[in-house]
Amino acid sequence: MKDLKLSNFKGKFISRTSHWGLTGKKLRYFITIASMTGFSLFGYDQGLMASLITGKQFNYEFPATKENGDHDRHATVVQGATTSCYELGCFAGSLFVMFCGERIGRKPLILMGSVITIIGAVISTCAFRGYWALGQFIIGRVVTGVGTGLNTSTIPVWQSEMSKAENRGLLVNLEGSTIAFGTMIAYWIDFGLSYTNSSVQWRFPVSMQIVFALFLLAFMIKLPESPRWLISQSRTEEARYLVGTLDDADPNDEEVITEVAMLHDAVNRTKHEKHSLSSLFSRGRSQNLQRALIAASTQFFQQFTGCNAAIYYSTVLFNKTIKLDYRLSMIIGGVFATIYALSTIGSFFLIEKLGRRKLFLLGATGQAVSFTITFACLVKENKENARGAAVGLFLFITFFGLSLLSLPWIYPPEIASMKVRASTNAFSTCTNWLCNFAVVMFTPIFIGQSGWGCYLFFAVMNYLYIPVIFFFYPETAGRSLEEIDIIFAKAYEDGTQPWRVANHLPKLSLQEVEDHANALGSYDDEMEKEDFGEDRVEDTYNQINGDNSSSSSNIKNEDTVNDKANFEG
């Protein structure tokens, strides 16, 4: 029998099975920390331009961004373009993942994203007045965006596939919540450096992106690939080793082999499906099209319900629509970002207890009411009404941090099928960045024309989101990714909506998932039904166990020992 060794698993450039010498919960904690680092970088980028775009030194270095009067349309367009060009880069990165993500794997994409982010930040930081400075800054923003697009499309999928069903939502919610903490850090750094009368005022905040990216890069170099992805690439031995490592169990344990067999079987249901974009939009029992549209809708409505209009331009909103002076607007913007970060704490308790569906509904309803208050107060401008408008903004960011901040990053990889999970998540993330670009580009122009009209538009979009959630979003809390496949297949067979099936279908064990899959005929249309008979998992189990039963105890080779010694040292 073949002797499994970790050295046999190493690729040409990176190891897919390295794990810092950690196992079980400690390894999962490290995976969570790496994911949080990636999304805190994303949040930092979101908050970065809020105060910089109208900062004195930034406007001096890039004169085209300086407004001359309250209705300088040219300057507001340049401000919008300088801020939103980042989203175009993010879109390009997400598009790359959608087409190539399944072939490359989760870990290499995150490493690539980190390196590209560093390159982009260096380009932007080194822009100097008189040397096509604004063009260089924008190019750096776009390059940074490409790196962020790779990371935001990949990290949620990677962490979802590395997590247990019972705490998957909590762990992915942690990474989403760190977006708010990254934004808060950016706001307060911008405020602190606003007293500086040199280019350090904007260069230091921009260069801080490098620090976040370096931390993510350092974590990821020795964190493992997703076992589900390894199985999809017929690298079952590596997957079995990693499942045992994540469970802190011997790869020969019956539970480990059974889990790998179930994953193997789930992946093989679509093994013969062609690797093309058309797979993402297939229908039938897989319902990939419906799942992709649901995933994309979470990101579409996250943007068009007003979150980044408030986050990217909070200082501008307080200054222009609520008529606070610039310095006070920056302070209130910092408080705004702090409340945003603190509001995410509540989501840790609600994400599993309340569930995804109810939390979506709570968030959309609360945001709709909040923006209704803001727009109503701004119709007739005076000092008292301005305070009411500010209250509406603070209520909005509280509801957003509690719900719709994290959910669009948790939900898409949960509802996607294994074969197109990376593509589905990338498709939803592409939707995010296109909508994000539109909102960030046109919000300053919209505000300049009609402050209250801007909030009325976002309030209406929030009200429209409520029926979309109610009629199309199934509950996924506490369910394995394979159970969710069953929900959509059963909805197709019964001619009903997935949310109805999810409400009535009890939680399933691994064997019950397989029984339902056989009963529903959840196999690829190009394959024969007999390939998925009731003994399939048992056959897979016997094959995996028989091929490798005597070998896995030898997995700890010299490389693993050295890695562990170096880490502990």
UniProtKB/Swiss-Prot annotation:
Lineage: Eukaryota, Fungi, Dikarya, Ascomycota, Saccharomycotina
Topological relation to the membrane, as annotated: Multi-pass membrane protein
Source species: Saccharomyces cerevisiae (strain ATCC 204508 / S288c) (Baker's yeast)
GO BP field: glycerol transmembrane transport; transmembrane transport
Transmembrane regions listed in the UniProt entry: 30-50, 80-100, 108-128, 130-150, 169-189, 204-224, 292-312, 331-351, 359-379, 390-410, 427-447, 454-474
Primary location group: membrane
Assigned keywords, A-Z: Glycoprotein, Membrane, Repeat, Sugar transport, Transmembrane, Transmembrane helix, Transport
The protein's name in its UniProt record: Sugar transporter STL1
Record has Chloroplast as a keyword: no
